[in-house]
Amino acid sequence: MSFEDLIDLKAYLDSLPAVKNEVPPYELGFPFNIRRGLGLWHKLYVNGESFVPDPHASAELNRGAYLVTGPGHCTECHSSRNLLGGIVKDTEFAGAPKPEGKGSVPNITPSDDGIGDWSEDDIAYLLETGNTPDFDVIAESMAPVQENMAQLTAADRKAIAAYIKSLPPRPDAVPKSKQKDEDDEEGGAAKSGSDSGAKHPDVPQ
C-alpha cells in the first residue's frame, strides 16, 4: 500500500472511540515464538517494496492491481502455500486448500478451471452484491470480504474486475479429484465459480 493510504488508515483508527479492556498476553508456541525466524521468513516471502504502476497498462488496470495486490491481498487466500507458509508463485490466484482442512478456495484466474467464462461485469456484480453469475451466493469466509468490497466505489470494483480478467490463466492448484472428494464429504457441489454458463438475470451483459 502507498504511504499516504497507510497514514489515512492510521488517522481513521485514531478517530475511533477508545475502548478499555483487558488484552490477553501475546503468546506463541515454538518455533513461532522465535523472532529471528520471523525475520528470515519475511526476507523469503514478504515483498516490502511499494506498488509501482505499470507504465504500459491503463489507469484502470493499475488501480485494480493496486487494490488486488495491496489492501485486497487476494493472493493470501486464493493461492497455495508451501510447508513454510509462503505463497507458491505458480499458484497465485489459482486456488488453495482451505486452512480449516476441508474444501478449497476457488481459482479466480480467467482459465477454464477458474472464472474464464465470467465477464468483468460479472466480477464487479459479485463484489457489489455477493451473487455469482452461476446463481450462487458468496458464503463462509468470503462473505465479510464481499461486504467490504461493496463499500468501494463502482469504479474501484470495475478496476478490480479488469485486473482479475487480465491475470494469466492457470489450472486449479487443488486437483479436481481432491475437490470432489471434499465436496462429497460435505454433501455439496464444488463452487468453483465456473461450473455453469448461466448468467445472473440482473448482471448487465
Predicted regions and their residues:
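Electron-transfer interface patches adjacent to heme c in soluble/periplasmic c-type cytochromes
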Residues: 1-4, 91-132, 144-158
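Electrostatic cytochrome c docking/interface patches
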Residues: 39-69, 112, 183-205
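Extended intrinsically disordered, low-complexity coil regions enriched in Ser, Thr, Gly, Ala
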Residues: 81-87, 117-122, 132-140, 171-182
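Residue-level signal for pocket-adjacent positions within structured domains
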Residues: 25, 103, 137
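C-type cytochrome heme-c attachment and multiheme electron-transfer modules
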Residues: 41-62, 108, 115, 125-135, ...
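Hydrophobic, ordered structural segments
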Residues: 1-59, 65-67, 81-82, 150, ...
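The canonical Cys-X-X-Cys-His
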Residues: 9, 64-67, 71-81, 123, ...
